A protein has these predicted regions:
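Short hydrophobic alpha-helices and adjacent helix-cap/hinge residues
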Residues: 4, 17-212
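Bacterial N-terminal signal peptides
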Residues: 6-16
Length: 212
């Protein structure tokens, strides 16, 4: 497992595809981009098409799938997502890019069989993850009791993670400098996994650095 800057994503993709060309395998290389949520948000849509166009210039095709993990109600629905991908892509993609840890938690079993040894890049990776699929689907706030180090989910796989720092303390500090008499801070978010985790980051930053 490697932890690297988001800026070298394309170098990593090229690096994972190079061995295929070196072995003289089929030139029909395909990168599959799986979004833990969907591609409706402008940044996600822009991200995919940027990847798509950059790869297309190199003769590599790219496809996208939305996993809609926040909408999954139970393990049966999660298994249905995995079964859909297994049927739709019986021939393993050359590489997989996963936007967000939740998608990896739901789909990692694909890399035990039909997609075994396929290199995967997980963006927006966190240090601690839900201890089980059930914890993820419950939307429960993560604690020491119901979470594990991310390495527990990633060990043994051909996986590279890209971490995203959210600068909670730095953002609050900037606001505090602009509004020195600020007494309350409102953080507006939704019920997605990453939003819950970011709320925790903001809460911790306030309690640790701005106790007053």
């Amino acid at each position: 497992m490697r932890i690297i800057s988001f800026l070298v994503l394309f170098l990593i993709i090229e690096g994972t595809l190079s061995p295929v060309s070196a072995r003289g395998e089929s030139s029909n290389k395909e990168v599959l981009v799986l979004n833990s949520i969907n591609f409706n948000l402008p940044w996600a849509k822009h991200f995919y098409w940027y990847v798509h166009d950059a790869l297309q210039e190199k003769g590599i095709s790219a496809k996208a799938e939305s996993l809609s993990v926040p909408a999954l109600a139970n393990e049966m629905e999660a298994n249905a997502v995995v079964d859909h991908l297994r049927r739709k892509y019986p021939v393993p993609p050359t590489a997989v890019v996963l936007i967000g840890d939740p998608g990896w938690i739901v789909c990692h079993e694909l890399f035990d069989d039909v997609w075994k040894d396929v290199p995967v890049i997980v963006t927006n990776a966190r240090d601690r993850l839900p201890a089980s699929l059930d914890v993820l689907l419950s939307h429960a706030p993560l604690t020491e009791a119901n979470s594990v180090p991310g390495e527990e989910w990633r060990r043994g796989y051909n996986i590279t993670i890209l971490k995203q720092h959210y600068y909670a303390k730095e953002t609050i500090d900037m606001i505090y400098q602009l509004i020195p008499d600020m007494e309350r801070l409102a953080f507006i978010s939704d019920d997605r996994y990453i939003s819950e985790e970011t709320r925790g980051d903001v809460r911790e930053a306030v309690e640790k650095n701005f106790p007053d």
